[in-house]
């Protein structure tokens, strides 16, 4: 299984390829077009590549696996670009936009990780069986493939940690803004409470309420409230 980025859904999807190796042939089976395999075929147009790849079934298998992992590596490029874009938007008052982009990134990283993790078991199994099938000469080639996979897995983990750190930072920035807004509303509530209370008192329909029955009672009460606001 190898990841291919879906630009419409903004997530990595899996492409599957089966490789059957016999003493004489290397057979690949896939159910849809695989760009990595097409690139491998086109590279055979160079005589030096063709000669090296077709030295034996082991060399051809090694060549195909290298191309597939190189393709998986390139599929990380869009993730690298998005991680860089998110990093640049931090601390620039784009918390909602950053949160949305991080959500897409986390989904893409999770799908990518699920797909490529199956490669580890396959490569390790091939390393064990390949030495028995092709001989000890194949060990160095298969270890090279495993090394490429480990490099890919480590880079993927670095991106996951970076995105997690960005998410924590963005959440802290959003919390700070929420606290500031809550503080502002608390101050406003405290400042307006005396006037709300004053208005409630003078709105009571009682005979002894002061100023209400005066000729200019409304304006007197309004002047008191405005003076109080200006005094604050």
Q: What feature does the model see in each segment?
A:
Residues 147-232:
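Hydrophobic alpha-helical transmembrane segments and their immediately adjacent juxtamembrane loops
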Residues 126-139, 163-175:
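Long amphipathic alpha-helical coiled-coil segments
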Residues 1-135, 141-144, 148-158, 211-213, ...:
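Peripheral, non-transmembrane regulatory/ligand-interaction domains of membrane transport proteins
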